[in-house]
Amino acid sequence: IVYLGDTARVPYGAKSHETIVRYTLQTGAILRGFDPKLLVIACNTASAHGLQALQAASACPVLGVIEPGAEAAAALPGPVGVLGTLATVQSGAYEAAIRHRRPDAIIHSVACPLLVGLAAEGWLEDPITEAVCRRYLNQLSFEVKHVVLGCTHYPLLLPSLNRARPGTAWIDSGTVAAQAVESMLRSIGFRTESARGPLRVLLTDASSRLQTVGETFLGEPLGRLEVVEL
């Protein structure tokens, strides 16, 4: 696996459609240099705005995280909640993808611009984080029992989210996207049964703090980080 994190220019969530598309194409071009079997846009905001452009520019399949998350949400009964960045929510990508599968779906979307920063700072179970989560979640109808975590940072905040809204079933867009990646690799004959391969981590900006945060996300050491220029 070759992972590229655009750490010099995140967060994408408050940027314009045109900027997000440009950033997605630039980072995708670097990854295409490794001749990958599959490209995954492991960011909801970049998936919402840049997926089609990167698919058009790439010879290999390109998968985002919106469609797998929407498929999981559409399979569940009742109203669906979606938490995401401002750019993801404003794109309407989740609403469109869920209603493509379940036309009568009732969807409540909430932009949560503060959550990415709290996750990146490591304030995962801080009282302030819980209060912010509760402020956002209170915007959802009480009838909503299933909520899509429409940003790959948000699962880190599950302890605070669960305390803020007990009894909610959370749909982790990253987890269901990983399952979709495995399924796609099998379908195109590229899924290997061998032992786990190496992980190569590329960043557009690096610091010791970024390594700490990255290892919190992954749950294991990242090893040597490589800095690339766009």
Predicted regions and their residues:
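Non-catalytic structural scaffold of enzyme domains
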Residues: 1-230
